[in-house]
């Protein structure tokens, strides 16, 4: 568990208590009595990726005779918008083209998504951080990361447009320089 967050649990509890008071609620009433503790515990889980390095997920690396696209698509994730501290959630699609047959376990791609999504985050940064981790750890010929997400800050407040999705993409290496490769990966992502 993230030591920094764990050591600040009491501080989080106090802040939630004060927030409830500032909202005009009675933090000592039965329904709210344990809320500060529950919220602090929830934040431990939701922000567990703060002190983790997504590159550490790529410890299992194998040499295989595979030089074509590796894609893990439709990876569900949840994160917290750093602007409003409300969730955004969606699907991540992570593709790479191995260099010299250097591949990783498929679950490692999902684990990297998990680590960077468990932070106060922006979708744009989330996309870049996944691509960076994959690129630095495996040194592939190309990387393409695409994320589609619904942001509760657009659904529950402000413009109130439920169901609207934000799509971000990072394309590197041969996936960027070779239009045909890029289009093939995007077609694979959209293929059911």
Swiss-Prot record:
Lineage of the species this protein comes from: Bacteria, Bacillati, Bacillota, Bacilli, Lactobacillales
Keyword Transmembrane among record annotations: no
Keyword set for this entry?
A: GTP-binding, Hydrolase, Metal-binding, Nucleotide-binding, One-carbon metabolism, Zinc
- Underlying gene: folE
Judging by the UniProt lineage, the source's domain of life is: Bacteria
The identity of this protein, by name, is GTP cyclohydrolase 1
GO MF annotations in UniProt: GTP binding; GTP cyclohydrolase I activity; zinc ion binding
Q: What are its GO biological-process terms?
A: one-carbon metabolic process; tetrahydrobiopterin biosynthetic process; tetrahydrofolate biosynthetic process
Q: Which organism is it from?
A: Streptococcus mutans serotype c (strain ATCC 700610 / UA159)
How does the record describe its quaternary structure? Answer: Toroid-shaped homodecamer, composed of two pentamers of five dimers.
Which of the seven top EC classes does this enzyme belong to?
Answer: hydrolase
Q: Which residues form the signal peptide?
A: none
The Swiss-Prot or TrEMBL record describes its family as follows:
Belongs to the GTP cyclohydrolase I family.
Q: What is its EC number?
A: 3.5.4.16
Which pathway is this protein assigned to?
Cofactor biosynthesis; 7,8-dihydroneopterin triphosphate biosynthesis; 7,8-dihydroneopterin triphosphate from GTP: step 1/1
Q: Which GO terms describe its cellular component?
A: cytoplasm
PROSITE patterns referenced in this protein's UniProt entry, alphabetically: GTP_CYCLOHYDROL_1_1, GTP_CYCLOHYDROL_1_2
At which positions is Zn(2+) bound? 81, 84, 153
Show the Pfam families listed in the entry.
GTP_cyclohydroI (PF01227)
